[in-house]
Amino acid sequence: MKASQFFISTLKEAPADAEIVSHKLMMRAGMIKKLGAGLYTYMPVGLRVIRKVEQIVREEMNAAGAVEVLMPVVQPGELWQETGRWDKMGDELLRFKDRHERDFVMQPTSEEVVTDIARTEIRSYKQLPVNFYQIQTKFRDERRPRFGIMRGREFTMKDAYSFDRDAEGLKVSYQKMYDAYTRIFQRFGLEFRAVAADNGAIGGSGSHEFHVIADTGEDAIIYCPDSDYAANIEAAEAVAPAAPRAAATEALTKTHTPGRAKCEAVAEQLGIPLQRTIKSIVLATEVEGGEPQIWLLLLRGDHELNEVKASKVPGLADFRFATEGEILRAFGTRPGYLGPVGTKLPVKVVADRTAAAMSDFVVGANEEDYHFTGVNWGRDLPEPEVYDLRNVVAGDASPDGKGTLAICRGIEVGHVFMLGTRYSEAMNATFLDENGKTQPMVMGCYGIGITRILGAAIEQNYDARGIIWPASIAPFQVVICPVGYDRSDAVREEADRLHAELVAAGIDVMLDDRGERPGAMFADWELIGVPFRVVVGDRGLKEGKLEFQGRRDEAATAVAPADVLATLKARLAQ
């Protein structure tokens, strides 16, 4: 490839609306061009990276036995109504009507369509297992698109869907996809971690997320440095304190705490650690034909509620936060002074494991400007229902008992789910087993954000000069930068010769024949992030040398023209 036959458009400054590093660098490198909110055109440089990513994904999916299909972006609404996701997905699901007033959606995922394929095409257990995958455009009508392609509305995704005859078969299919994802991210050349996760809106019984490690990542990744334990913040288990609850040593006392509506302020006034306080969080659930049920969740003062965990408490699946009016009726006071002792109306009390292990604690007295001190379970109030309700923090014990937990940041780029029979039962996707009995197919689904990979890779690999692509997904593996290409016959001839040699060897090479000044030429390719550069100049040619430099190298190395290919291959193999 020659630059004169390509399209290169770089910027010295990023647009004002570009917030994060990847967005700024992709815009400056001419990889993407904004069309509208959350909508981007992928320019030639960016598209080359996408094609590299797709190629690796496609190779590994095929190797794992998945079969490629291509499903429509526009899907009939009736399929989504069958599964109930028409109503559950909310405004992110773009719904519209055609000229005949029929409902359609712009797909964010394709569980409904692929399940429809399975129920019409698969009849017998002999046709199972099967795994369909596609690399296709998706659309989510994000309320606030931001961060460039990291949270756009239109994006490209690889989504796969496995169908098995039973749960044991699903475990095999799931492991195949987990292993394939591991190989994919290894081939991308990215530092990543697979973590246990919650299934969220897609549903199912088990899942893992694949995160690219980056300090700028939105997601907290919980892991144990001394073991293989890893989970996202939603799924990471906060184990119960190992020590038994201490005996009560203080009397229950109502204490005046004027204006202290926060645990931190109460602890400061009383001169006690924040860990001696308990925070009260009030939730509500709807009761058909009656008043909402009020719930009081209790956590240690320095801990934060994990809403996903709370939703798993029996009866709290569809909780909402209580209104101020509901709180006033149930407790007789406003938030900041609430507690489980002496409520006006009966409420359901649920304590986090750590809160349930506390003694002599401080909690709201259900009277403005007052808190109780010296509160103890069993003596001052009944023993509560106990669940894991909180986010873990660094230093917590690892659930596998092999050390303590640490936290890093990551960007989610892949997710694998065990769906089970949620969709197959809803859509009557069944098969006949060897006994002639009808059984629901057991499903898994597996997604990778193709375009999101670009942003995540940049967030992990950049410096002050620009992007540093891993060689496997770089737009070009090497760029030849001739100094004086338009002026020196010797430079032009050697650059053309080297270009031809590398092309013949299967190297993805760019020859910059634009005649740019060296500084501008080097700056463009450092910004774009090509992993290796070969400089051809008159001075070096007179000495029988070319300059070879990796994007992360501090200085160039002199290499004989005949040795460039071998040197490049050796570096690419590292």
Curated annotation (Swiss-Prot):
GO biological process: prolyl-tRNA aminoacylation
Alphabetized Pfam families for the sequence: HGTP_anticodon (PF03129), tRNA-synt_2b (PF00587), tRNA_edit (PF04073)
Top-tier EC class: ligase
Catalytic reactions on record: tRNA(Pro) + L-proline + ATP = L-prolyl-tRNA(Pro) + AMP + diphosphate
Keyword Protein biosynthesis: yes
EC number: 6.1.1.15
InterPro entries per UniProt: aa-tRNA-synt_IIb, aa-tRNA-synth_II, aa-tRNA-synth_II/BPL/LPL, Anticodon-bd, Anticodon-bd_dom_sf, Pro-tRNA-ligase_IIa, Pro-tRNA-synth_IIa_bac-type, Pro-tRNA-Synthase_IIa_type1
GO cellular component, one term: cytosol
CDD domains: ProRS-INS, ProRS_anticodon_short, ProRS_core_prok
GO molecular function: aminoacyl-tRNA deacylase activity; ATP binding; proline-tRNA ligase activity
Keywords assigned: Aminoacyl-tRNA synthetase, ATP-binding, Cytoplasm, Ligase, Nucleotide-binding, Protein biosynthesis
Subcellular location: Cytoplasm
Annotated family: Belongs to the class-II aminoacyl-tRNA synthetase family. ProS type 1 subfamily.
NCBIfam families: PRK09194.1 (NF006625), proS_fam_II (TIGR00409)
Primary role: Catalyzes the attachment of proline to tRNA(Pro) in a two-step reaction: proline is first activated by ATP to form Pro-AMP and then transferred to the acceptor end of tRNA(Pro). As ProRS can inadvertently accommodate and process non-cognate amino acids such as alanine and cysteine, to avoid such errors it has two additional distinct editing activities against alanine. One activity is designated as 'pretransfer' editing and involves the tRNA(Pro)-independent hydrolysis of activated Ala-AMP.
The protein's assembly and partners: Homodimer.
Free-text comment on this protein's domains from its UniProt entry: Consists of three domains: the N-terminal catalytic domain, the editing domain and the C-terminal anticodon-binding domain.
Name listed for the protein in its UniProt record: Proline--tRNA ligase
